[in-house]
Amino acid sequence: CIRDRLLIILYICLVGLLAAATFVEQAYGTDFVERNIYHTCWFCCLWGVIAAIALVALIRRALWRRFPILLFHGSLLVILVGAMITFTGSKKGYVHLLPGVTAGSFQESESGREADLPFTIQLDSFRIAYYPGTEAPADYISYITYSLPGQKNVLLHEQISMNRIFTSQGFRFYQSSFDDDGKGSWLTVNYDPWGTGVTYAGYI
């Protein structure tokens, strides 16, 4: 029927869009993709239309009796819920760390406002790792010290690199850039304690 054909077409469009967004993200960065694709009204509407059609098909055809189809449509709805949680409740930004300077907040990407962190973080040192025998950078590594809420006298040490994410209190820190003098470090901050987990559950 027309509804099924429309659902298939929208599925194909969504998959193609997500694939294209992956390449765009590699070329222009995560902030660009989120601002121009993931966090736009038309993208949310696309997800909403697909979810609505899938839900109608699920009810009208009693698809809950066919477990594989139920699992497929159910996972789609779970992914949509996770995406909406991320859209409405997540925070993203960046923090600039300097050696020996304690930071307790980060700057939000969209609003430019300072948002508090539930803990403090300090850069101990930053270094660039090179491929053996070359001057080609292999990794950027920030060595940090942080303290947990209510435990300021308890200092914990961690390192953040291109392939190593630091997670604490629902905040995820990614190594993104560094100062020209090679001393300061820039970290991307992502706060999404529920949305990411719900979305991953849908894919599983």
Language model segments and positions:
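Solvent-exposed, non-transmembrane regions of integral membrane proteins
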Residues: 3-204
